[in-house]
Amino acid sequence: MSSRIILISCVSKKLNYKTEAEKLYISPLFKYNLRYAKSLKPDKIFVLSAKYGLVGLKQRIEPYDLTLNKMSLAEIKKWSNQVVKKLSKVANLKKDEFTFLAGQKYRQYLIPEINNYKIPLKGLGIGKQLGYLKNKVANEEKCSQLHRYFNSLKRLKFPFLDKNIPKNGIYILFEKKELAHEGNRIVRIGTHTGLNQLRSRLKQHFIQENKDRSIFRKNIGRCFLNKQKDSFLEKWELDLTAKKDKEKNSQLIDFKKQKKIEQKVSKYIQDNFSFVVFPIEDKKKRLALESKIISTISLCNECKPSKNWFGFNSPKGKIKESGLWLVNELYKEPLSDKDIKELKNI
């Protein structure tokens, strides 16, 4: 199993006394880099110090007046070789995934020694780096607020009663063993387009064994089949809703097998998912709010699926990447502060 490691470059603005590395550097850029790095929930975070090389966050170091920006190429190469030597003792340079929150001079001779890496701030000036990091950190706080709020609402699960569900609104799904923001992790957000159809929509997911009426059911079935490398996955993809498609494809499908998969999907959903609901009467407002909630959660680096999350068996890259049982409305416009305030007042 590979590890996720983040490397943050040091800065000139420091405290004037010996302390832990994560506290020594006091510039806004370093502080936001560190907050962002921690939000990613990596396995390890290190500081790239111009004087001390590779430094752990809790390592106590003295302040110093040294930067790679004033070093010659030969000095930078020597420094980089020392960092690589240290790094190779605490990480697998060929298998681990590295994220650089560091300038060009700090990373240029490290990158050739590493196979897997990301540079999210590449090409950005200091001002734009701060803007990027502030947005990331702010979105994580919004996502945390959403999780705290939705985790506080009355939780429903199968079997559920119509009287506990509004006719029009939005549902928020949670999945067993999935955690985020000190609570249950949100794994799906959904609504309906037809008038008074929220109850019906939830029944299509939880009860009615017809994957062509529920993309959520179809995605759960895809995971079962893909995990088993079952060739029936190709037939599972066929949609028999339209009359012409039913006439064309029915003879291709083993309906006894399909029924067994539908039953398996029902059991998995009923046993593993719970949800909360809240009313939104206006269709346009429902759809807009659904989209913004999805985007807010998909943009949050703290909302990571567990290592054994069932969704990792999906053939859909967007599901595996986002950690959500969704492929639409990901990474778009998140909720504003005003949106969150209004949401809590519904």
Residue ranges and their predicted role:
Residues 1-141:
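Peripheral peptide segments
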